[in-house]
């Protein structure tokens, strides 16, 4: 994580995680992540929120065939995503790579933005990109029916932590006031 001013953190990002979907709903977040990654040279992990399921894990688990889970990395390449049956999402990762970005994917196993924040922190991300209009309880326990923007504003206003970039549906980006 970073302790530089937020504007500098975006320009000098080495790793960013973007909260995206398999369909077109959050393509504006994916596009913004691709652009920031292309400009800064950052590694981009597209975090697929749609893969979370109450009934199954998107990744092989201890009940899978012998060593099946060991064949996949973290994060996942577009080829690994295809092997896991996630072709539409794999195509998004491949498109970002074709645009010159060091792009990877990850399949959410838990619902909500708390899971993507935890993933970003665990992987040492500098930035996290979230849709500005997302209304979902849970973001770091701060969302109670409010928008992501309101939750981030309530986050501790410190100089350290995960820099949050909010992406509007028209693709405009804005740095959130607080860090997570």
Where is each model-derived feature located?
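Structural beta-alpha unit
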Residues: 1-10, 94-128, 171-174, 180
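Small/aliphatic-rich secondary-structure junction motif
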Residues: 7-73, 165
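Short beta->alpha connector loops
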Residues: 22-25, 109-113, 134-135
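Short, well-ordered secondary-structure micro-motifs
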Residues: 28, 56-59, 117-118, 140-141, ...
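Well-ordered alpha-helical segments embedded in enzymatic catalytic cores
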Residues: 29-32, 88, 115
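Short, hinge-like loop/turn segments at secondary-structure boundaries
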Residues: 61-65, 122-124, 146-147
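A short acidic, glycine-rich active-site loop
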Residues: 68-87
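Glycine-rich, Arg-bearing micro-motifs that act as flexible, cationic patches
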Residues: 127-157, 173-176
């Amino acid at each position: 994580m970073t302790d530089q001013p937020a504007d500098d953190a975006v320009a000098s990002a080495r790793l960013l995680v973007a909260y995206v979907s398999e369909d077109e709903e959050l393509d504006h977040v994916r596009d913004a992540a691709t652009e920031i990654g292309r400009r800064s040279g950052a590694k981009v992990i597209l975090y697929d929120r749609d893969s979370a399921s109450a009934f199954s894990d998107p990744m092989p688990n201890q009940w899978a065939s012998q060593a099946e889970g060991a064949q996949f990395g973290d994060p996942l390449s577009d080829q690994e995503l295809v092997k896991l049956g996630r072709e539409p999402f794999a195509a998004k990762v491949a498109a970002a790579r074709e645009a010159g970005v060091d792009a990877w994917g990850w399949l959410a196993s838990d619902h909500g933005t708390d899971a993507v924040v935890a993933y970003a922190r665990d992987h040492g991300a500098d930035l996290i990109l979230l849709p500005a209009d997302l209304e979902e309880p849970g973001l770091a326990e701060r969302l109670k029916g409010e928008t992501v923007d309101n939750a981030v504003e309530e986050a501790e206003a410190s100089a350290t932590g995960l820099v949050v970039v909010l992406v509007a549906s028209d693709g405009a980006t804005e740095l959130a006031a607080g860090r997570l």
